[in-house]
Amino acid sequence: MSEETVQRIRALAIPPAWTDVWICPYPMGHLQATGTDAAGRRQYLYHERWRARRDAEKFDRMLTFAHRLPQVRERVDSDLERRGLPREKGLAVAVRLLDLALFRVGSESYTRDHGSFGLATVRRDHVRTSGDVIRFDYRAKSGQRRVQEVRDAELAPIVRTLKRRRDDNAELLAYRGGTGWRDVRSEDVNAYVKELAGEGYSAKDFRTWHGTVFAAMALAVGGEVPGTQAARRRRISDAVKEVALELGNTPAVARASYIDPRLLDRYEEGFTIGGALADVSDGDLADPAFRDAVEAAVLRLLEDGRPELAAA
């Protein structure tokens, strides 16, 4: 084995706990290594250039998703107005929650294997309501306790109905089908999102878009962009930590997977969404008018950086 190959393998930093490791023999292969971690899950290491290209494509897709969100929300609003609790209304409840609270959609198999929950598997006893407030308290991915509150006058009574329904299923989300209740499953939610937003989109795209929106707000609330690179990078680091806390991820994962890098580039250039809004620190993303203004400002900043609208 050549010294060059040895150095490439070392640079992959394959975790020592991995077993059944395979390493690509070609330095430019898009998949550089695979292995099984200590929890028995198959893991993958990709070439940096391939990951960068895929990440760029993902965030470009997010811009299209953001442009389609108004029509998605319009359909969700319409389905929430249906009488009773038919399938469309049950799925609309799920998507409204995805849009408001940064949930992972979860899956039945992941809950079974790891004992943690996402939106599709959260149980009735994980949820409390008080007036317009819905409070979720559950064990999320990696065993983290997640406490999330949603204030929504339309959703709260529907959630109370779901909690009080008479059937043996522990999961919160359900709809009336035929003569009884049927669980809302993760594949149902993803199919509904695809129907509303288009081919290739899923429940996860709400978290990705909102991660960028939260980062844009965090950077704008910080005030005028600092004049030195070191100070700007400290502000970026603080904003990433805030987003990670909202998402329930590490800062590294939040930055790599949920924050459009162009947003951080714009900040380094001296621009935020602050100039497009009266005061982003006083708004509430649960307010549709404020949310729409913030999202429009983020889109302008990412798509063409219009400084007359975006400068801090």
Predicted regions and their residues:
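Extended hydrophobic/aromatic segments used for targeting, binding, or gating
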Residues: 159, 244, 265, 271-274
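Short, amphipathic C-terminal "tail helix"
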Residues: 263-270, 285-312
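A positively charged, amphipathic N-terminal helix/segment that binds anionic biomolecules
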Residues: 1-117, 121-236, 240-247, 252-256, ...
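Short Lys/Arg-enriched helix C-cap and helix-to-coil transition segments
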Residues: 137-139, 267-281
